[in-house]
Amino acid sequence: MEMNPLLVCATVAIVFATTTIIRILFSSSSLPQMKWPSGPRKLPIIGNLHQLGDDVLHVALAKLAKVHGSVMTIWIGSWRPVIVISDIEKAWEVLVNKSADYGARDMPEITKIASASWHTISTSDAGSFWQNVRKGLQSGAMGPLNVAAQNQYQERDMKRLIKAMSDEAANNNGIVKPLDHIKKNTVRLLTRLIFGQAFDDNKFIESMHYEIEDIIRISGYARLAEAFYYAKYLPSHKKAEREAFLVKCRVEELVRPLLSSKPPTNSYLYFLLSQNFEEEVIIFCIFELYLLGVDSTSSTTTWALAYLIREQGAQEKLYQDIRMTLGDVDLVKIEDVNKLKYLQGVVKETMRMKPIAPLAIPHKTAKETTLMGTKVAKGTRIMVNLYALHHNQNIWPDPYKFMPERFLEGETGTAYNKAMEQSFLPFSAGMRICAGMDLGKLQFAFALANLVNAFKWSCVEEGKLPDMGEELSFVLLMKTPLEARIAGRNV
């Protein structure tokens, strides 16, 4: 006997609605018992999702904060309340002054698959494991002496990158897609920090680049399950879980053979092996560096290039800053990057306009604490909107305008005041500030200086400016990857 398809669909819908209502009734009693900050009115089942509109999440939340206050409760679906902070004073209370209280993590369930069940720096709570691994990374592989030892290799890689872009432009009517070139350069740097300077395997680099792309694609499915509890049982989410598991297996297959090597003592692998961690933990602590380091540097660099294409005056100022400071050089050396004042302004302004992680990595209270004197229960989810802090018009004049001069002192710039300094948090702040912050800033500045020194950047078509639309994944990506026309500088 055949069943009526409409009857089947109706039955499924009724079951879904019934179980969702049951979930709402029972989950409300399990929420942290506290007085939640006010926020926009929520609807059954969907919570505040209907008020997030067509904007990317950080922009939508910034708009809601202007109406409902700088500390508000947002319901992601009907079962996940999140306190969203869009004010610098409250942000500092959470991130800095009470960083231990707010130092736990709130990660999507699907991320357990490729993080050794949340045993990595970014996904684990702020306990002894987290402290040990973070310290080992920062004092060893990312220590100042080890990073400085990479300079000659990075400068060699940059020459290769410039040559590769020149070749691409020559074969494509002057047009290039810079993102992949920058990504692969970053993979090479991280590979040397992880496995040692002698490691140079192009096949490994290509394979790791592919796995990073794949896990970022899959991560988008996590949002549906975060909003609707039973969405994790849908075929699309189950498919995402299977694909994430396949990435996990491929990453293990890629990295596992390297664990039996004898890495140099200043490498990240040497430190991880010395701690007698389980193999899975070692592999995914390594994968984490690629996952968070590659796209953050490459995406921020392409954002900067897009702004400089749109603002040709700023691009010319940067080029003249290089020429006036360093002369007619073929390559800007890493040791010279900090001499370039306008470059530093462009770097900071890009990170202000397009923070790498505009909502940081979500926090959760590790114990009962307070916010502005009001009780906040253990297990409460907290989100700090760094984008909102960076676009507060009371602190940043013309906040939506790209102005590197705002970070400069003197005749051509505005005074960089204390309020701006406290509100500029592209890498978050406090004990959970990005572990690779210093390296990330240096690589961004080094890449940008050399790309502007080597090429003049312009629109692919006259008058057709780069699309500045955003896509939020692990980091803030360009919705439409940058394409540009380049011409070699006559130096």
Swiss-Prot record:
Annotated GO MF terms: (S)-canadine synthase activity; heme binding; iron ion binding; monooxygenase activity
UniProt cross-references to PROSITE patterns, sorted A to Z: CYTOCHROME_P450
Superkingdom as given in the UniProt entry: Eukaryota
Reaction(s) this enzyme catalyzes, per UniProt: (S)-tetrahydrocolumbamine + reduced [NADPH--hemoprotein reductase] + O2 = (S)-canadine + oxidized [NADPH--hemoprotein reductase] + 2 H2O + H(+)
GO CC annotation, single: endoplasmic reticulum membrane
Expression sites by tissue: Expressed at low levels in roots.
GO biological process: isoquinoline alkaloid biosynthetic process
Protein EC: 1.14.19.68
Membrane topology: Single-pass membrane protein
Pfam families assigned to the protein according to its UniProt record, in alphabetical order: p450
Cell location: Endoplasmic reticulum membrane; Microsome membrane
The name this protein goes by in its record: (S)-canadine synthase
Protein's organism: Coptis japonica
